[in-house]
Amino acid sequence: MIQATLLISLSCLSFYTLGSGVRRYDPGQGVTIQYLSLAPDTFDDAYVGCSEEMEEKAVLLLEKEMANHTRLRESWETAQKAWEQKRAGLTLPPGFRSQHGIAIMVYTNSSNTLYRELNQAVRTGGGSWESYMKHFPFKALHFYLTRALQLLRGGGGCSREPRQEVFRGVRRIHFVPKSVGDSIRLGQFASSSLDEAVACGFGSATFFSLRTCSGAPIQALSVFPEEREVLIPPYEVFVVSNFSKDGNKSLMTLSSSDQMCSHFNCAYLGEKKRPSCEFVPIGGQGDSLSKGAFSLLSWKTLLLASWGFQLLGAGL
């Protein structure tokens, strides 16, 4: 199965560049090589235990941020009009609000560059809580998009339904794991496709075959439904199952650990950055866990590791 996956294609999907580790330039190949990691500088809030409070705060927060960011305001207004036409024909999960759908349409509209700005901010915006509060310009959009994926995917992670196989590629960057078996995060909102043929039309430098537990199918809400997109949140932890080189192409298989890890939780409400990335099951998202339960689960996970049980990321 793994070998078959790695032989899939020689020119594969490239939706958006992801960033997770140290970069170096290889002048002999004319490409950037980037090592995958747990992406410690990512803003990775999953809003565990505070999603309802954030729903209340985000309304005014979005207005404030749109007033300070012209492209955000224009993109949101365009998506809002499109959403009003699209929403009538959709069957949406309980709790799914218009803002969640609009956020997805904002993100998938590649006619503007807002998705790139958002992901650049996500990749680098988690250096500190103070930096997030002062300089992260998409707090409301990040919340709405994160919450949309949680609601569309549903609770329970892979305990509720099996890992979903998707494909993703990146042009101009060769992503490399430090070793097979590493735990890594993609470190941004990462687009992928259910359709390998679609995936192979987007790039060739790095090809990922992924099995995700928290990626959500957004085809019905996307500006480009024909891409059969599955959007993966920044906090999902993957294990590198296999890696190979085929000429100047990197081929990698990632399998979800069915865990998320976050340095941040409810940051906008005052929760500071944790010194280590705390692991909890993917099923414990939104308000299904309290903030206290999130911390307790994380502490127990680390304790089990010290007793010699398997912990994803222990070798990093």
UniProtKB/Swiss-Prot annotation:
Its EC number is 2.4.2.31. Transmembrane segments: none annotated. GO terms for molecular function: NAD+ poly-ADP-ribosyltransferase activity; NAD+-protein-arginine ADP-ribosyltransferase activity; nucleotidyltransferase activity. The active site is at 168, 191, 229. It catalyses: L-arginyl-[protein] + NAD(+) = N(omega)-(ADP-D-ribosyl)-L-arginyl-[protein] + nicotinamide + H(+). Glycans are attached at residues 68, 109, 242, 248. One of its GO terms (cellular component) is membrane. It comes from the Eukaryota. Keywords: Disulfide bond, Glycoprotein, Glycosyltransferase, Membrane, NAD, NADP, Nucleotidyltransferase, Secreted, Signal, Transferase. Residues 1-23 form the signal peptide. NAD(+) binds at residues 107, 168, 188, 222. PANTHER family: ADP-RIBOSYLTRANSFERASE, ECTO-ADP-RIBOSYLTRANSFERASE 5. This is Ecto-ADP-ribosyltransferase 5. It comes from Bos taurus (Bovine).
